[in-house]
Amino acid sequence: MEGRGRALCRPEEEPFADQWNILAAAAGAKPLAFLLGDFNSEADVRGEGYDLILRSGWQDTYRLARQRDDGYTVVQAIDGWRDAPDAAAKKRIDQIWCSQAVPVHSSRVVFGGKQEPRVSDHAGVLIEVER
């Protein structure tokens, strides 16, 4: 990916929409691209970052999955969210996005304290793509 080795987004300088546009442009030049990580944008909150990504034409692999768990990667108050009114609410802010719809067999939270030990304030996400 062009830009490898340099910061594409500087959160302290650019709001989410600008960061997303830079990242999507860099990744979207490929025929098939996956973007994953902590997007700090709740999947069930309308009109914010999650909806911006959807409107950009990217696919949430969690929604594409034939089998999935509840998807919550944050299940308690964490740094950066402690002062929010819903700080203790479960959140799905760690996501895997794909530049086009692909057949996703399953999506599940890993290292979230259920099947594997919790290792961070965020759990990971694992998808299995069908061939």
Located regions from the model:
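Active-site regions of metal-assisted phosphoester/phosphodiester hydrolases
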Residues: 1-131
